[in-house]
Amino acid sequence: VILKMGPHKKNQCDYFIEIFDSHCNETDNHTLLQEIIENRKTFISNQLGESNIGNLADLFSTQAAKDIIGKQASPTLPKHYFLIEQVALRLFGCLLSCWTELEIFRTIKNSTLTIIQNADNAHHTYNSPVINEHFHYEIVADIALDTRLFHTEFCDQPLRLSDAIVLINIATFIKEHQWYEMLGMLNISSKGEHFILYQFNDKSAYPNIISSALINSAPTSRNWLFFDDFFQSSKWQPIHQSYSILNLECATKISTTLGKSQLMNKSSDDIEKSIFSSILDHKKVCEAIRLTVSGSKSKANFYLYLAQKGLANALKESGRDVVFTIIEKPAMVLFYQSMNIDTPEASPYLFTSAQDINKNGVVTYKGIWLLKNATLAFNQYNFKEYNVKIIGLRKLLRNH
């Protein structure tokens, strides 16, 4: 049945995904494709040796992967798995791309079924603060419990909030940036505390999600991405920023137990853990990750500005003072660097470490958002003035 394809490539792909998902449901094996990928991952990794193992995208792009996948059946998997692998490879060019499309299909399908089943109990009230006249922002305590519907640019129909955020994360982080590791952890995107920024239009009763971010509270800090082993290795170069302690004390309105000796000549790991442990009231601390911005490319920079402004205000209104976060978008980095140069004693962002992870010139930064200063900055500078700060520093850096 799997080999009976329609005349067009897209139709073939859609048809394959649909009947494959049906097969998984009938056999009660929803991780079949994941089993194939994990099996291939292990085999290829053993072929290459540990020193050559990158992320999934790198691993499945190697010559070793090309020589094996779709060409040599795995001796440890059922025979029909190899047929599935061959068809998936022919249609999608990569097993990881096929897995991505499968999760998109499942997200939309499951959301549609849930909406139909709970139509009588749906709660569609959208009351939240507004920024720049037309954009609403809020923090949702647990998106898994939210029954409201939202549009995304990745689906024609409205979806439940949790499914909309999962779909946005798949499209943004996995399809665009090839962070395929996230496919096995999509449940993280479907629950818990989240920030959302959205906008209504005249064409639908449901708003469009412009931005979202996952918020992790201090009690879960052991599981924060910020403190994950990958982000605490010696590859991260520490950044020593002037006035760090003064900024932290002013931002938290209380004294910390931090001393200068804990920051000087220390590794980024030591610096970041010292800062976290020094903050006396952990209810005022959180991590914000997976910041997404959706919409047309022409408005991408404006939406990124609004997302930061909305997130800073929302977190401050929720009682937070300090936010641990990881950023790499050049516009964000340049704006914070510019503000730190202009107002070093009122820094909106304390940079703690940096690394060019993919060796492509795009540096990823770790640091701490100080909400008192960040909200002042974003409420002081409109989008045009925000851009002037970014462009000005970019020109300055080019000339040096």
Please annotate each region the language model reported:
Residues 330-400:
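Accessory, usually C-terminal, subdomains that scaffold auxiliary metal cofactors
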Residues 230-361:
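Acyl-donor binding region in acyl/amide transferases
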Residues 2-278, 397-400:
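Non-catalytic substrate-recognition and accessory regions of acyl/acetyltransferase enzymes
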Residues 1, 87, 130, 140, ...:
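Extended aliphatic helical segments
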Residues 191-195, 284, 361-367:
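Short beta-strand micro-motifs in enzyme catalytic cores
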Residues 217-219, 295, 371-375:
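Non-catalytic surface loops within mature trypsin-like serine protease
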